[in-house]
């Protein structure tokens, strides 16, 4: 089993954890329907980039 030679410093620990923060997802507003949606996803109405993609 691997055992570390020396205790990692607070600086090294912080540098390792620098990318662990949670990021908020980007929300977009459709220009036709005005609904919010995730980027590169269709709205609940079936619109994508101003065009009707899905029929209900």
From Swiss-Prot:
- Keyword Ribonucleoprotein in the entry? The reply is yes
Name the keywords, alphabetized.
Ribonucleoprotein, Ribosomal protein
Pfam families per UniProt: Ribosomal_L32p
Disordered: region residues: 1-34
Q: What are the GO cellular component annotations?
A: large ribosomal subunit
Task: Set out the biological process GO terms recorded for this chain's protein.
Answer: translation
A GO MF annotation of the entry reads:
structural constituent of ribosome
User: Of which family is this protein a member?
Assistant: Belongs to the bacterial ribosomal protein bL32 family.
Record's HAMAP family? Ribosomal_bL32
* NCBIfam families attached to this UniProt entry: rpmF_bact
Provide the protein name.
Large ribosomal subunit protein bL32
Which source organism?
A: Baumannia cicadellinicola subsp. Homalodisca coagulata
Taxonomic placement: Bacteria, Pseudomonadati, Pseudomonadota, Gammaproteobacteria, Candidatus Palibaumannia
Question: What is this protein's gene name?
Answer: rpmF
